[in-house]
Amino acid sequence: MIRSFLIMFSCLWFHQSAVAFPTERFPIPPASANRLFYIQRSSNANTVIYDANILPNKSLNPNQPVHTYWIRYADNGQKEELNLIQRTLAYGLYTNKIKDEINSFEGYFLAYRKRKFVVKLNAKNQAIALFPINGKLQILERVFVSVDESGFTPAVNYIELFGKDEVTNKDVYERFKP
C-alpha cells in the first residue's frame, strides 16, 4: 500500500527536476467550468488535473465521470493524457455510481484507498469532488505533495489538502503524513 502511494505521488519515470518549489510558486492551472481539483508535487511544476466529464445533456458520464490528465508546465505547458501506468497505478481513479442518487459517484485513488471521495453535481448543477478533509467531506480544490527524492525510493514528506466547506464556503485545509 505504501509503495503504491509513493508511486502515485512521485511517478519517477516523469521527474524532470529535483528542485523543490514552494506551494505558492506553482502555476495555477487555467480555470475550467468542469474542474474538480488538481495535484501538484514538490518534484516539479507538472500538474495532474481532474475534471468532471460532463455529457451534452449536462450529466456526468457514467462510464468515466472524471477525466484525468497532465499540464506539463516543466516542459512547454502542454496538456497530455496520462499513460497506462499513471492511469492504472498512480493517478487513476476508481469510481462507482452511488445507487439511488442521480449524477453521484463514489471513488478512490487506485494507489491510495484510505480516503474515499464523492463526485457529484451540486444544487447549482456544478460538478464537485467531496473529499475527507479534517474528518469531514469537503469540496477538494487542490492537493500539494511534498516528496523527498534524496533516497533510492522517493518518500512522501507530507500532503496538503485545500478546499472549501460545502455549506459555509469557508476555506478548509489539512496537512498530514501518509
Label for each model-derived stretch:
Residues R3, R25, R35, R41, ...:
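Arginine residue identity/basic-tract feature
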Residues M1-R25:
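Bacterial Sec-dependent N-terminal signal peptides
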Residues A18-L84, D171:
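N-terminal export/targeting and maturation segments
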Residues M1, A20-P22, P29, D51, ...:
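Serine/threonine-rich low-complexity intrinsically disordered regions
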Residues K114-P178:
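Extracytoplasmic electrostatic interaction patches
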